[in-house]
Amino acid sequence: MPVAGAAVWAIEHAIATAVAFTGHGNSMALAWLVSFLLLWWIPLSWMERPVTTTTRQQRILDELVVTVQVPVYNEDEPALRDCLQSVFDQSRTVDRIRVVDDGSIDKATNTPITYPATKAWFLEEASRRRIHGTWDRTVNRGKRHAQMHVLADDPGDIFVTLDSDSILDREAVAEGLKPFRDPNVRSVAGCVIVLNSRSNLLTRMLCMLYTPFTRGFRSAQSVLKRVMVNSGTLAFYRADVVRAHAGIYENEQFLGRPMQMNDDSMLTMYAMLAGDTVHQPSSIVFTLVPETWKHYRNQSMRWMRGTFVRTFWWMKYMPVTGAGFWMPVAELLQLLLSVVIPVALVADPAQRAHASSLIWSVVLVALAMNWLIALRFFMVARDDEPLSFHVWLVLLAPLAGLWRMFVLRPMHLYAMVTCWKVSNWGTRDAVEVAAAPAFEDAAVSLPDDVTVRIPRIPVAKLLDPETEKTLTLPIPRPREPVNAQFEPETLA
């Protein structure tokens, strides 16, 4: 129904535009048509379905050698252990787990942080489960170098990149491998679920922003097999794609500065140049979102700057006839129209005469669009979130639209003019951990009756991107004891 409704609406806009070119009708018809077309992803996102496999395809996937890489830097030790435990507990056993400590150090005392207890437990547990586990410590050079320290020469078939404070659902790896039944698929994005969705008003707002993106914009891109950015929280890659760019990926530069952000979009672009990139909504990982404005502001600016810089790479390397080229162009056009259209309306006396009706039309359309997007909340059901919570999120979805317009849009413009700050990544000065109350187990259900379950017990770890200090937040904790290549990436 969303697709049919969008088609009817598009025809109406096209007719209005044709009439306007005859000298009659609304002089802004073309601008409204373009604005409408930029919402292409909303109806398309409803066409995404989790990829499934036949018995024969599953046997082939079961033969793949899977390597999980976990970079670590000044990590909260209990959170790191929870992350590794979630990898051990996968229904589809992985073959290798490669942990790389990127020179963790306590800056207050200038002494190395080596995680001796967790390292010993990890290596012993890996041996007991007959999984090849390694734990290396390197000089601090950043996440990309930590990843390629082991992946450049790893002989695996599939590489899984996982943040060290993420918690995998038990079926995450099994589900994430299924799209690789298609030999043209080069990378798979996991589905990121907000864990601390009800902590405060900000996390509720971010939940309204995250879910429509992961199950909206990214889902629409997946239908086209052109997911532009995998989440660094959880992503799967054909190993040859990553190995082919060793030495280039970790040394990317922009305006002579090393790129310390958007590593995930770089790997995704490599995959897009070699084949298809998709999203698997049933491969679920739980993550934490900021609980303070300062944390959220700095995280958003970092992402926006990195994405804007990556736009230059997309437009340079993506085929001009493909969706990978035009999607970032559409994003820039949408940003431009958000500034130009209001100015044009104010400058046109004819439009000013109908200002009240025009404003009401815009408001009604915005409400409809935001509510249509918000219906994606019902695509993921959790037993730690009552149905009433999702109903309220849908009803309040227009607030997210206002947030995008009056908060994120100005931030995006500022990020564009300060995009040269790509090397500001910071370092953690300390690790601060506190326990939170225990909860019962939580489950996540998808429309096709896929149910995922994780134990939810206290933990504390969320990194502030400016101070790099950890914040006290609840995250799950187990109850058990404890191929195309191109020039090196520089843009002057």
Give residue spans per PLM region.
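Short hydrophobic helices that act as membrane-entry/anchoring signals
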Residues: G5, A16, T203, C207-R218, ...
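Serine/threonine-rich intrinsically disordered cytosolic regulatory regions enriched
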Residues: D448-T490
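Non-transmembrane catalytic domains and loops of membrane-associated enzymes and transporters
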Residues: Q58-T321, A492
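Alpha-helical membrane-protein architecture signal
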Residues: W293, R297, G322-W326, L395, ...
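N-terminal membrane-anchoring/stem segments of glycan-assembly enzymes
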Residues: M1-D62, R404-C419, D464, E468, ...
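Cytosolic juxtamembrane regulatory segments of multi-pass membrane proteins
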Residues: L64-E77, L399-L413, E432-I454
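Membrane-embedded multi-pass helical conduit in multi-pass membrane proteins
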Residues: I11-V34, Q58-I60, P328-K421
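Hydrophobic alpha-helical transmembrane segments and immediately flanking/interface helices
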Residues: I97-D106, N424-V444
